[in-house]
């Protein structure tokens, strides 16, 4: 027998009351986005489950993709069949025969939501267990901690049989907690921050600052590929490229070296906030980790934050660098993040940046700039690209091959 579908069990959605179906429908849409590379599959949801019909597609890559989607508590490859006792008996016998080995223990666990079905749960357990003994007389039944728990569900539309339960990513479906703008440089920390924001249901749009010719096409492709990795957790992400060359040159030419980083970050924050307002976001997300670099001391954060009243979410703010690296490796962004392309945060970096910048000094130095004009020109020059889940090739590897 081949699996018919993957049955997805919802996570925290069961606690969402009147909004439950909104959360479930969002999860369904996210699953459809993530599984877009598999055109044969079909997705439908009800209040208790989401069903991914395989329609002949190999189940293993579908399972691997679904395991990453936020809002999925658990999933099981299942056999779907008509609600017929003879069909159930044959299916259970075939499945257990294929799984059997010496010393194997099992139990049948039936759940019947269709109360019009001819047998109740206890009767089905007894009947199907007896059917297994008919073909496997040496097998042992065990009610506590068996090797195999064969789950049989009798629902209104069909019967379902499964024996695997695979842990999902948990969290909330992406898009159920509003929209935020993720400041993504291309380093290790910001993709991890984006991942953690996605886990709590935030619909992120990625804001990436590019300063050609100081930053290369490779740096831009790297940021887009990091964004593509994040699409695996909840579907498509809008990637917003911000032209930043003019501003960085202005800062380099007119500001004291010690304040280059502070002023650069203040401009980035202003621009991100303007894009957030334009695109109806609610928060800004970044990868700042307290004390990790000069721009991430409390004094620096205070001086940079002063340009906006928008809430700033910093998911990795209390994490050690090693913890962030381990999470980046776990979510498969680390190898991309360490590719040697310079970004806006590394070009023009001063040798001795100010670790305790004064807000008054930053504001005084900014009097040398046409702040509104610079911000307006940057925002009007943004390029928005929809990033969809990757299908086959790692685009960064392809880019490197092309450059060599």
Curated annotation (Swiss-Prot):
Keywords: ATP-binding, Cytoplasm, Nucleotide-binding, RNA-binding, Thiamine biosynthesis, Transferase, tRNA-binding. InterPro entries: Rossmann-like_a/b/a_fold, ThiI_AANH, ThiI_fer, ThiI_N, THUMP_dom, THUMP_ThiI, tRNA_STrfase, tRNA_sulfurtransferase_ThiI. It holds the Pfam family THUMP. Its main location: cytoplasm. One of its GO terms (biological process) is thiamine diphosphate biosynthetic process. SUPFAM superfamilies: Adenine nucleotide alpha hydrolases-like, THUMP domain-like. Residues 60-165 form the THUMP domain. Pathway: Cofactor biosynthesis; thiamine diphosphate biosynthesis. It catalyses: [ThiI sulfur-carrier protein]-S-sulfanyl-L-cysteine + a uridine in tRNA + 2 reduced [2Fe-2S]-[ferredoxin] + ATP + H(+) = [ThiI sulfur-carrier protein]-L-cysteine + a 4-thiouridine in tRNA + 2 oxidized [2Fe-2S]-[ferredoxin] + AMP + diphosphate; [ThiS sulfur-carrier protein]-C-terminal Gly-Gly-AMP + S-sulfanyl-L-cysteinyl-[cysteine desulfurase] + AH2 = [ThiS sulfur-carrier protein]-C-terminal-Gly-aminoethanethioate + L-cysteinyl-[cysteine desulfurase] + A + AMP + 2 H(+). SMART domains: THUMP. This is Probable tRNA sulfurtransferase. The gene is thiI.
